[in-house]
Structures are given as structure tokens and as C-alpha cells.
A protein has these predicted regions:
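Short, flexible, mixed-charge acidic loops at enzyme active sites
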Residues: 53-59, 95, 230-237, 292
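ATP-dependent carboxylate activation and anion-phosphoryl transfer catalytic cores
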Residues: 4, 13, 129, 250-328
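Hydrophobic beta-strand scaffold residues
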Residues: 38, 103-104, 132, 157, ...
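A glycine- and small-aliphatic-rich helix-loop capping segment at beta-alpha/alpha-beta transitions
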Residues: 95-104, 175, 180, 308-311
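Phosphate-binding site of ATP-dependent enzymes
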Residues: 174-259, 280, 284-286
Length: 328
């Protein structure tokens, strides 16, 4: 039997491009060339470029997402997606694959687009009984009345792009005069802006996967940092940020965080790897955001959780691919 042809897609159109490429490297190290024919497909503003497992370029037909290597046309059996942000995390790439009938790891169009839209996701989950910070969605900066917004949400508050990840374009606003510049910054990154009340407390994050067909929590990690908040620098470049797994919280709260993360995963209809971020405030877990294409670089949180939980990444990937290709 021929080996499944796996397309590892990476890159993207945002400042998360570099993180995606690092995530792809980790996946490549955990996908066996003995089990799969692996092709790395890189997307940028110029389109797709494709490489075989020797890093030699191959031709990609974007109209049907097939490859041509040594004169042979290859149909892709499964896609492993590591594109953070648009178009890999917001449903656009998933829609493209659905139209072409290409199978892919991770969330479908609806789950991806809902999860990536922070304001809509928070509203949906709040209706399901999940605690989230108070927030206002900004469609046009001309609509903002700073005094009314501060009266409703309080200070400090957070301003963030409604549709971006890795804390890009996020500001912590402490004075009313900082609000409009923060919103302008967020609009430079995303199409909509979310202004959110600040919830003070311990930052936690929890991973979720499907293991043996069962939605399973991985571990809870505690995040300690010296920055004002867990921004891009604190996540990827700081030498003082501490990511502690397992989180140093009581067992009841730890288990509650894992149960809640599984519940959110199911409510959003997610598949594949997933991470949910929280603030623990006065014994209550407030959801900050979810990640349906979580970072998988050596500096990322989910690989650390997998290591603690003794969940080998290659085994989890094998299971996901087997389900997509109907091969054991």
C-alpha cells in the first residue's frame, strides 16, 4: 500500500508567519517519512510554494490542490495546518479545502470562524454559561465615545484586534486618553476591535486533544510574567516569563479548568489540537480566548503540556491522520 500523502501547510498573511514556520518545523520532526510522503506547502502573499521531504521544489496546482512531482500528479490525502491567523485559523482555508474535497486536521469552517472572532465567540460562550470579561465590539473608530466606554468597562481595560492572535496589536489602557490610540493600533492589525474589561488574577491555559477518539484535556499551565500582560514579547522573546506545568493551583481548580476546557471545545464543535486561555479571579475561571491552531514551536505552550502529560506528539498526529485517511 502506498503511503498517505500529507501536506503540511504553513506561513500565512500576518505577522504570525514566523511562528507558523517554527510550528511547522516541530510537526516535521514528529511526522515519520517512513509512514508518510510529506510535502511542506508555504503560503504567503505571492501564493503557494511546495517542497518535498528533501526540500526540493515541486509544482502545486492551486485550482485543485494537487501536486506534481517527477511528472506524476499527486492527490493530497490529508492536510496538517499550522497557519496561525488568517487564512488558516479563521475558516477561510478550511472553506477552500471543503470546496475541493480535501481532508484536513483541525476545526471546520464554522468552528474556526466563530472561535477566531473573539467578540462573537465570547458572546456565544457567555450564552452557554461560560464566564468572560465584559466587552464592547468596535466596528468603526468614529463610533467610539471614550467616556461612555470607560464608564461601562472601567480602567484599566484591554484593547485588542477582534481577529488576530499572539497578542499582536493588543494594548492595556490605563487612562482615557490612551483609548483611541490603542483602538487605532488594533485596527492596524484587524478588521474589528474588541475593548475588554481587565480581569485581575492568575493567567492559566489548558490544552485539549482527541486521544483514542475521546476529547481529552492535556494539562493546565500557569503563566508568570513581568510585562503588563502576556503580550507577543512576553510569549516569545522574554527571558523572565515563566510557564509552569502543572499550574500551582489547588486540585479542585485544576480539574475544573480541564473540565471547562473540554466543555468549551465541545460547545464550539472543535477538532484537532486546541488551547483555551483563562484568568483565575477570586476562584472563578474567566475565559480570555481560544486557539484552534495553537502555536507548536519550541517556545509554545502546548508542546510543554504534551511533554508533562507524556503524550507523544507523533502519536497524536498519527491518530489524527489515521482518522482522516481511514488507515490504521
Amino acid at each position: 500500500m502506498s503511503k498517505p500523502i500529507i501536506a503540511l501547510v504553513c506561513g500565512g498573511f500576518t505577522d504570525e508567519y514566523a511562528i507558523s514556520m517554527k510550528s511547522a518545523d516541530l510537526y516535521l520532526n514528529n511526522l515519520s517519512n517512513e509512514k508518510y510522503d510529506i510535502y511542506k506547502l508555504v503560503l504567503d502573499n505571492n501564493g503557494w510554494t511546495a517542497f518535498d521531504n528533501r526540500n526540493e521544489p515541486v509544482t502545486i496546482n492551486e485550482s485543485n490542490f494537487t501536486l506534481k512531482n517527477n511528472g506524476q500528479t499527486l492527490a493530497i490525502d490529508a492536510v496538517v495546518n499550522t497557519i496561525h491567523g488568517t487564512p488558516g485559523e479563521d475558516g477561510k482555508l478550511q472553506g477552500y479545502f471543503d470546496v475541493l474535497g480535501v481532508k484536513y486536521m483541525g476545526c471546520n469552517v464554522l468552528s474556526s470562524s466563530l472561535s477566531f472572532n473573539k467578540g462573537f465567540c465570547n458572546h456565544f460562550l457567555e450564552k452557554q454559561g461560560i464566564l468572560v470579561p465584559n466587552s464592547k465590539l468596535v466596528y468603526e473608530i468614529e463610533d467610539v465615545n471614550p467616556q461612555e466606554m470607560i464608564d461601562e468597562l472601567g480602567l484599566p481595560c484591554f484593547v485588542k484586534p477582534n481577529d488576530a492572535g499572539s497578542s499582536l496589536g493588543v494594548s492595556k489602557v490605563k487612562k482615557m486618553e490612551e483609548l483611541i490610540p490603542a483602538i487605532e493600533l488594533a485596527f492596524s492589525v484587524g478588521q474589528r476591535v474588541l475593548v475588554e474589561s481587565s480581569v485581575q488574577g492568575l493567567e492559566l491555559t489548558c490544552g485539549v486533544v482527541r486521544k483514542n477518539g475521546i476529547v481529552t484535556p492535556v494539562a493546565v499551565t500557569e503563566i508568570q510574567f513581568e510585562a503588563e500582560f502576556f503580550d507577543y514579547e512576553a510569549k516569545y522573546n522574554s527571558t523572565t516569563t515563566q510557564e509552569i506545568t502543572p499550574a500551582r493551583i489547588d486540585k479542585e481548580t485544576y480539574n475544573a479548568c480541564m473540565v471547562l476546557s473540554v466543555d468549551i471545545y465541545k460547545k464550539l464543535g472543535c477538532s484537532g489540537f486546541f488551547r483555551a486561555d483563562y484568568i483565575l479571579h477570586e476562584g472563578e475561571l474567566y475565559l480570555i480566548e481560544v486557539n484552534t491552531v495553537p502555536g507548536m514551536s519550541s517556545a509554545s505552550l502546548l508542546p510543554q503540556m504534551f511533554s508533562y502529560a507524556k503524550m507523544p506528539i507523533h502519536e497524536l498526529l498519527d491518530e489524527e491522520i489515521a482518522e482522516l485517511t481511514n488507515r490504521e
